[in-house]
Amino acid sequence: MDDDLKSIASKYYIGGHISVSGGLHLAPERASIFGFRTFQFFSKNQMRWNSTPISEEEALRFISEVSSHSISSTMVHASYLINLASSSNELHQKSFNAFVEEIQRAERIDATFLTFHPGSNGNKDEGIRKIKEAIEKVETHKVKLLVENTAGQGNVIGSTIYEIGQIIDGFDSSVGVCIDTCHAWAAGYDITNKYDEFIDELDSAIGLDRIYAFHLNDAMKDLGSNIDRHELIGRGKIGEGLIKLISDVRLFGKPKIMETPYGEAKFEENLKYIRKKLGE
């Protein structure tokens, strides 16, 4: 990939979700191909409860590769199966155990962030309480725990900025937020036409200082559809709103992770669109 595109990724702290096929230690080099200084990955199969432990050798190789490729932050995405909000005591406990394991795995490889979905519960207040209780029960952790906003499908918690703010309220800076732009759009936040209102609401309900990262995704479906379908940047319904976010000086230094269709195969296309719209 040409150096101009790499410089865009580096300058605006844009990264992407990277495959760990063949081993965790291969991910940093894959990220560096695009000029990424940050990237996201799964440390285990995201659709299974069980996992193979990360060996000390594998952890050290990963940490060494992160350093040698000048990666400044890494984000683990937790399993999709985890539902800390569940009204089922059995599922809640199983989810909590998996959550703790995810934290331990992230810390073993010196990951900067662990992002997780809030989960679902027909009773929002109960769900939020159970999520907060789970976070409180976690022993001291050095990896930052990031709650991700949701698209608003079914009984899923966290589609409103206010709910995300409720979840992190009362915790110190080791707990923060990752805002997914596609999810926000699907939940009814008009990032394109009402960008400043969106940022103002993030600041008032959460605090920009507690938003540590973004998932930079365009949206395939309409505003307020509650349908979570990511699209390539510039090919979806959000479009220019993402450029506003990327170039917003208030958000500089916060990782912006692409989770777009076709993964690494289309990151270059995303970056070309971004470069064109930025005029660089």
UniProtKB/Swiss-Prot annotation:
SMART domains: AP2Ec (SM00518)
Cofactor: Zn(2+)
GO process annotations (BP): base-excision repair
E.C. no: 3.1.21.2
The entry's keywords: DNA damage, DNA repair, Endonuclease, Hydrolase, Metal-binding, Nuclease, Zinc
UniProt cross-references to Gene3D superfamilies, sorted A to Z: Divalent-metal-dependent TIM barrel enzymes
Annotated residues for binding of Zn(2+) 1: H77, H117, E148
MF (Gene Ontology): deoxyribonuclease IV (phage-T4-induced) activity; DNA binding; DNA-(apurinic or apyrimidinic site) endonuclease activity; phosphoric diester hydrolase activity; zinc ion binding
Cofactor comment: Binds 3 Zn(2+) ions.
Entry annotated with the keyword Nuclease: yes
Binding residues for Zn(2+) 3: H183, D228, H230
Alphabetical list of InterPro entries matching this protein: AP_endonuc_2, AP_endonuc_F2_Zn_BS, Xyl_isomerase-like_sf, Xyl_isomerase-like_TIM-brl
Binding residue positions for Zn(2+) 2: E148, D180, H215, E259
Superkingdom as given in the UniProt entry: Archaea
Reactions catalysed, as given in the entry: Endonucleolytic cleavage to 5'-phosphooligonucleotide end-products
UniProt cross-references to CDD domains, sorted A to Z: AP2Ec
Family listed: Belongs to the AP endonuclease 2 family.
Stated role: Endonuclease IV plays a role in DNA repair. It cleaves phosphodiester bonds at apurinic or apyrimidinic (AP) sites, generating a 3'-hydroxyl group and a 5'-terminal sugar phosphate.
NCBIfam families per record: nfo
Protein name listed in UniProt: Probable endonuclease 4
Species name: Thermoplasma volcanium (strain ATCC 51530 / DSM 4299 / JCM 9571 / NBRC 15438 / GSS1)
